[in-house]
Each structure stands twice: as C-alpha cells, then as structure tokens.
C-alpha cells in the first residue's frame, strides 16, 4: 500500500478536485451551448436523435420476443409521460435534460467529496448549484430566437439532480456503514 505524506496528499486532492471542477464547468458549457441553439437547429438535433433511437429500438423490438414485451411497457410509459401519447420528441428531450443534470450533480458531488466537504453540505451545495444553473439556463434559453422557457424543463432537471444526489447519499451512507463496522479477527 502506498502511503503519501499529508502535504502530497493535499496536493493530489486539490489536483483531482480541480480536474472534477473543470469537468463540471465543461458540462455546464455543453448545456449552455445546447441552449444557445436557435429553435430550428435544436429541433433538427432532437429529430435526428429521435430517428436514430426509434430505428434502433424498433429493430430490436420487432426481432425478439422480449423486445415485443418491452415495446408494450415503453409505449405505456411514453403515453403516461406525454399527454400527446406517442410523443418521442418530447420524451427524448426530457431524457436529455434529466441525464445532463444527473451527471452535473454527480460531478459536483464527487468534486465536493474530494475536497473533503461533509456529506450534507455536498448535497446542499450540489442541489443549489444545479437549481441555480437550471433557472439560469431557462432564462438564457428564453432569449434565444425560436426557443421558449418552461418550468417543466427545470422540474425535469431537478428530478435528474435529485435522483443523482439520492443515489450518492445512499452509496456514501452504505460505504460509511461498511467502514464503521469492526472486522472479525481471523
């Protein structure tokens, strides 16, 4: 086992914290860039992704028995999520919002973990940063030609954030529990 001096350990923690913070900023830049696209470009990107996913999904679902059962479940889910029924377009956009903020919250949590911040503060800071950025992003998007700003997007963003932070909380609590249990002597 490699033992590092406290000074070297601090430098390594700072370096990793800085690298993860850069990843957070990079993901925020990607979100900002996607929100900066005008309505037509954004719609085209979503339509292209939608077609790729639909082709892949339909090919799998038509060729296997499990796929046919999965098709029924997914169709029910899409109808429950989307008031328009089979609205792949909106569902894919919601999944994109959810996923981006899921990973942003995860990166923030990891950054704060490496920096040595307590578990509760990691959750609070990650949640506040994601909420603030989601609100800023929707405000910014409202000023882009052909785009609208909706609180529904902020809600989906926060669902991704809360799911990520919930999983982080559970995993860190489980790891803390494992560390605190005395090990049996052999």
Predicted regions and their residues:
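Bulky hydrophobic segments
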Residues: 2-142, 151, 158-186
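Short beta-strand-loop-alpha-helix junction that forms the active-site gateway
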Residues: 145
């Amino acid at each position: 086992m490699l033992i590092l001096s406290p000074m070297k350990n601090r430098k390594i923690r700072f370096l990793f914290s800085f690298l993860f913070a850069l990843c957070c900023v990079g993901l925020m830049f990607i979100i900002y860039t996607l929100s900066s696209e005008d309505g037509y470009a954004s719609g085209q990107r979503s339509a292209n992704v939608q077609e790729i996913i639909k082709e892949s999904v339909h090919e799998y679902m038509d060729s296997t028995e499990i796929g046919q059962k999965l098709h029924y479940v997914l169709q029910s889910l899409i109808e429950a999520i989307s008031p328009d029924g089979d609205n792949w377009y909106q569902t894919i956009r919601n999944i994109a919002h959810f996923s981006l903020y899921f990973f942003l919250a995860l990166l923030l949590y990891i950054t704060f973990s490496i920096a040595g911040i307590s578990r509760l503060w990691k959750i609070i800071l990650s949640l506040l940063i994601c909420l603030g950025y989601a609100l800023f992003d929707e405000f910014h998007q409202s000023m882009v030609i052909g785009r609208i700003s909706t609180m529904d997007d902020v809600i989906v963003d926060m669902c991704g954030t809360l799911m990520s932070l919930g999983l982080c909380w559970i995993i860190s609590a489980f790891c803390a529990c494992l560390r605190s249990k005395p090990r049996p002597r052999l």
